[in-house]
Structures are given as C-alpha cells and as structure tokens.
Amino acid sequence: MPNIKSAIKRVKTNEKRRAQNAAQKSALRTAVKHFETAAANGDVEKAQAAFVEASKKLDKAATKGLIHKNAASRQKSRLAKKLNGLSA
C-alpha cells in the first residue's frame, strides 16, 4: 500500500476507472451479443434495433479509448454485413 498521499489517490482513482471500464466493456459485449442472437433468430426488426445500440456503444467505447477506433470500426462493419445479409 502506498504511503504518499498522491499515490494513495492514484490507487483509488485507478480502481474506480477500472470498474467503470469493465462495466462499459461488459455492456458493449452484451449489446453485440443481443445483435448476434437477433440475427441468428432471423428477426430483422430486433436485429436492426440491436445494431443501432451496439454501434452507439462501440463508438462511445472508441471515443473513450476503451477500444481502438479501428477495432470499433471493424466490429461495426462485420455487424452491418450480417444485418445486410438478413435483409437481402
């Protein structure tokens, strides 16, 4: 355990941020899974709604630095490809 006041604060801050990042990443994964299940069931309307939600979460995660912007873009592209496959 650190003795210096600023180091103690850093430990608290890092723990708080770690928890927030984990929660946001978990929500992101859940949103993507909701899309995947809707797409697997062939439900186009639910898939479209889930795609919008997943896209928002991916963009937000990329903006916050949680995931790389190219990774977010790649995931969105793959999801969009699946969605277009359902519609066609």
UniProtKB/Swiss-Prot annotation:
Belongs to the bacterial ribosomal protein bS20 family. Transmembrane segments: none annotated. GO terms for cellular component: cytosol; small ribosomal subunit. GO terms for biological process: translation. Signal peptide: none annotated. Keywords: Ribonucleoprotein, Ribosomal protein, RNA-binding, rRNA-binding. The gene is rpsT. This is Small ribosomal subunit protein bS20. It comes from the Bacteria. GO terms for molecular function: small ribosomal subunit rRNA binding; structural constituent of ribosome. Binds directly to 16S ribosomal RNA. Pfam families: Ribosomal_S20p. The keyword rRNA-binding applies. Residues 1-22, 69-88 are annotated as: Disordered.
